[in-house]
């Protein structure tokens, strides 16, 4: 399975509230720590984040997916927006980092009905049902969950010791943050696509301009009239 390199979260920052380095997880991204004492944070509306870790090694990670599953026959299903692919990627990256599959445990969050369009399609509820069903099938125990409801959530996950702090948010606040996060993601992808598709430009040294110098003509004075 090949994973797009830009699916790995890359927004590192220092959180002055928690006094530690952190990584922001945007929609369709994931991040895996290798025992570092990092904080992973995200904002969830109808999306779901699965926080997985190996408690023995402290290796852990988080994903952030938007939809439960896609058409298995479609190439678009193999993207991080779909839960099935996002879970597979997260588990595989944890194992590559040194986690043991039989020690993995999970905490899952999100799936809120925060937008009217999402409520009609039950996207949040379907996301929550999917992640619980997936983890049960994979024999990964769920140690904590906060799914559903009409609230959005801000998640702070500490993979090293397994702590998760959840803050419920007013729907209009969450909507604004998700819009910003989505715009950031689109902007980053557009910039990357532009850099890949930009035509090759050969650069040459600028030619030296030839400047001819002439003697400045003498100014005529009133006394020099003929």
UniProtKB/Swiss-Prot annotation:
Alphabetic keyword roster: Chemotaxis, Hydrolase
SUPFAM superfamilies xref list: CNF1/YfiH-like putative cysteine hydrolases (SSF64438)
Domain of life of the source: Bacteria
Pfam families: CheD (PF03975)
Matching InterPro entries: CheD-like_sf (IPR038592), Chemorcpt_Glu_NH3ase_CheD (IPR005659), Cytotoxic_necrot_fac-like_cat (IPR011324)
GO biological process terms, semicolon-separated: chemotaxis
Function recorded in the entry: Probably deamidates glutamine residues to glutamate on methyl-accepting chemotaxis receptors (MCPs), playing an important role in chemotaxis.
NCBIfam families: PRK13487.1 (NF010013), PRK13489.1 (NF010014)
Assigned protein family: Belongs to the CheD family.
Protein name: Probable chemoreceptor glutamine deamidase CheD
Gene: cheD
């Amino acid at each position: 399975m090949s994973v797009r390199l830009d699916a790995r979260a890359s927004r590192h920052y220092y959180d002055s509230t928690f006094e530690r380095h952190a990584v922001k997880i945007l929609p369709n991204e994931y991040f895996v720590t290798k025992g570092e004492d990092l904080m992973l944070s995200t904002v969830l509306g109808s999306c779901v984040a699965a926080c997985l870790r190996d408690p023995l090694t402290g290796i852990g990670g988080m994903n952030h997916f938007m939809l439960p599953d896609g058409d298995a026959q479609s190439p678009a299903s193999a993207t991080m927006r779909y839960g099935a692919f996002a879970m597979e990627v997260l588990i595989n990256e944890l194992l590559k980092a040194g986690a043991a599959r039989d020690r993995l445990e999970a905490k899952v969050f999100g799936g809120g009905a925060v937008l009217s369009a999402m409520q009609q399609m039950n996207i949040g509820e379907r996301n929550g049902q999917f992640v619980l069903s997936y983890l049960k099938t994979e024999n990964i125990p769920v140690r904590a969950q906060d799914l559903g409801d009409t609230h959005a959530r801000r998640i702070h996950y500490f993979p090293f010791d397994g702590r998760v702090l959840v803050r419920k948010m007013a729907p209009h606040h969450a909507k604004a943050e998700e819009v910003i996060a989505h715009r950031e993601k689109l902007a980053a992808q557009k910039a990357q696509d532009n850099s890949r598709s930009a035509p090759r430009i050969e650069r040459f040294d600028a030619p030296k301009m030839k400047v001819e110098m002439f003697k400045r003509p003498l100014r005529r004075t009133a006394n020099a009239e003929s």
